[in-house]
Amino acid sequence: TMKQWGQKPEDISPEVTGRVPVLVSYDNRYFQDKYQGVPKEGFTPMFERMLDHENITVETGVDCKERLRFEENQIYFDGTPFDGEVIYTGALDELFDCQFGRLPYRSLRFDFEHYEKESYQGHSVVNYTVSEDFTRITEFKYLTGQKNTDGTTIVKEYPFAYTGAEGEIPYYAILEPKNQELYEKYRALAGGLPHFYLLGRLAEYKYYNIDAMTKKAMELADAIMAENTKR
């Protein structure tokens, strides 16, 4: 916990520490959900198929602020007033140029290593809680179910404080009252924009697991469609 968050456990929000289960059980899985799995071909092909539609245009490597701007509670898209829905999933402080200060996050560095042997640690994920600089090692073949592989590949995760530098990714919001107060300032700026929805870890400054995030996204889509039906 101290390595991951850079704080003492007593200084960390119970919302965070409460995510780590302590179980007396013969079930040694981290999650206790009845159904668990990963996409057969991986997440990338799954998302590629989801986005492969004539009504969807994907642009990567584009800063949304190059296409969107906000003036007097009006959204402009490519310089033209836009009255449709915008679902924003990025960092909310960065959308508003961090004008109140940067929201604190923890980031991660991933170091991949390959070994010419059948197994490295014998399990998919092992947490390292003592003197190592990394917090956990993932050995992928135990997640994918691959057999007869040419060696084994692992990744070590090294946590550090997010600074906004190029190449860094904000993974985990640091849930403290002062940080929540700062987030609320940014949320107030977004609150006056019509049909502008905040969704996800960054936009909401919350921690979500993928199943909860998927459910939240589907609920938002249903709510938007229901609202459009009323208009």
Predicted regions and their residues:
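Conserved beta-strand scaffold positions in the cores of enzyme catalytic domains, especially
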Residues: 58, 86, 153-155, 195-198
